[in-house]
Amino acid sequence: MYAVFQSGGKQHRVAEGQTVRLEKIEVAPGESVEFGDILMVSNGEDVKIGTPFVSGGKVTAEVVTHGRGEKVKIVKFRRRKHSRTQMGHRQWFTEVKITGISA
C-alpha cells in the first residue's frame, strides 16, 4: 500500500515503513505526526484519487530526527571588476518514518 501526500509545498510518494525527508516541521523527535492532505491512496488493486484530497485519508509518521541538508554554494561573479561574492545555504529538514496509511 502506498500514498501520495502533500507537506511543505511538495508531494511525497510513501509506503509504510519508509523513511522520508520533509521540510522542517516543529515536532520533537520521537513524537507522532499526522498528514491529512492525501492526494492518492493505492493498495495494489484499489486506487483512490482525491479531488483534490482523499476524504478520510490520513498518513501517520514518527519524527526520527531534524537536521540540515548538504551545502549549496552560491557564487556571484562580475567579470573584469575583481569582484566576487560567495555564499552558502543549508536547508533544514525533518526525517520521518511512515507508521501507517489509512483511506
UniProtKB/Swiss-Prot annotation:
Q: Which PROSITE patterns match?
A: RIBOSOMAL_L21
| Keywords associated with the record | Ribonucleoprotein, Ribosomal protein, RNA-binding, rRNA-binding
One GO cellular component term noted in the UniProt record for this chain: cytoplasm
> Do the record's keywords include Ribonucleoprotein?
yes
A Gene Ontology MF term for this entry? Answer: rRNA binding
Q: Kindly give the InterPro entries that the UniProt entry links to this protein.
A: bL21-like, bL21-like_sf, Ribosomal_bL21, Ribosomal_bL21_CS
Q: Any one Gene Ontology biological process term?
A: translation
| Function as written in the Swiss-Prot or TrEMBL entry | This protein binds to 23S rRNA in the presence of protein L20.
The record's note on quaternary structure and interaction partners says: Part of the 50S ribosomal subunit. Contacts protein L20.
Record HAMAP family: Ribosomal_bL21
Membership in a protein family: Belongs to the bacterial ribosomal protein bL21 family.
Tell me what this protein is called.
Large ribosomal subunit protein bL21
The record lists the organism as Pseudoalteromonas atlantica (strain T6c / ATCC BAA-1087)
Task: Please spell out the taxonomic lineage of the organism that makes this protein.
Answer: Bacteria, Pseudomonadati, Pseudomonadota, Gammaproteobacteria, Alteromonadales
Q: Which gene encodes it?
A: rplU
